[in-house]
């Protein structure tokens, strides 16, 4: 059975990889930790939010686990460099290989997050168009499912040009 996530989040691979909005509310962070998340991939620039890494670590310790945080800053509505996207995907895959469930987020969980999730799906065998369609299916039922993800034409073009070997 899939563990519950906050209303703005969704599973890409149940119990392994989830994505969504910034976990600003203490309740959302607690729900993510309760769902088993142990690695947070933060796509927001430092200073955009107050930060949650220490609270995530505290909640995880109380549950007998560890929560790690990695920041890969991408400006809002922006795109990463190809090398940065590789580093993000490598971080996700490294934590998954270590059996550490991962949560990927930006601010709203749409543009930057959708771009990363779709590129991760391409890395793992989906054609770019199929990855974008799968992303919409995965987001069905979230609080903002009607919103575009990725948000911009440039973000969608980035995914469409992404190849597994990138």
Predicted regions and their residues:
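Conserved G/P- and acidic residue-centered "switch" motifs that form tight phosphate/ATP-binding loops
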Residues: 109
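C-terminal domain-closing interface element
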Residues: 158-166
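Short cysteine clusters
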Residues: 106
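Non-catalytic regulatory/accessory regions that flank a structured catalytic core
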Residues: 1-3
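Cysteine-based protein phosphatase catalytic domain of the PTP/DSP
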Residues: 5-6, 13-102, 123-154
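Short, small-residue alpha-helix embedded
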Residues: 113-124
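Short, flexible helix/strand-to-coil boundary loops that buttress conserved ligand/catalytic motifs
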Residues: 44, 117, 163
